[in-house]
Amino acid sequence: MVNLQTQLKSEVGVLAEYISEELSVFIVAENKPDDHPANGGLRLLNYETDMECLQDGFRLANLMKSKHDLYSTGFSGGKVVARSSDISSVKEKLISVTSELLENLDGRMITGCDLNTDVNDMEKLYKLTPHVLAAVNSNVDASTATAMGVIGCLLYTSDAADEKRW
């Protein structure tokens, strides 16, 4: 897709990476100008390979791109994806590595919770880098808020199907 104002093609690519035997972390995001930082959650899964992790990162970053475009959030699409076969033992290293990668990007990527990360992880990450968008130090549980939105959509869809509105 071409940005009509800048005439630049907006593509998703790897902005930063860390690879080791126990943990690999990839920041995959759109290459938009600095005034449109990328946004997407930090996902930690037991991917079989780094390639599988990267492929999921590209898929998810493109979905985040569509989401941010649809809702005109001002963000570009991005995702932080991490691979480990021992998820519970790498959490501290994940937070440390991710903070360094985010800091090196100097605000081009902002992350939050996703699969196998929670607000406690985001609070630790936020102590190391300001590039976190989550319900840090809040009484609001962002996961509950997201779940309520999904439930609302399902209820609406169910009602619409019953009334044959589509």
Regions inferred by a protein language model and the residue ranges of each:
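Charged catalytic carboxylate motif
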Residues: 52, 56, 149, 157
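N-terminal ligand-binding/catalytic initiation module
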Residues: 1-140
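A glycine-rich, Thr/Ser-enriched phosphate-binding loop motif common to dinucleotide/cofactor-binding enzymes
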Residues: 137-153
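Single conserved hydrophobic/aromatic residue that forms the stacking wall/gate
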Residues: 156-166
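Short, well-ordered amphipathic alpha-helices
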Residues: 61, 153-155
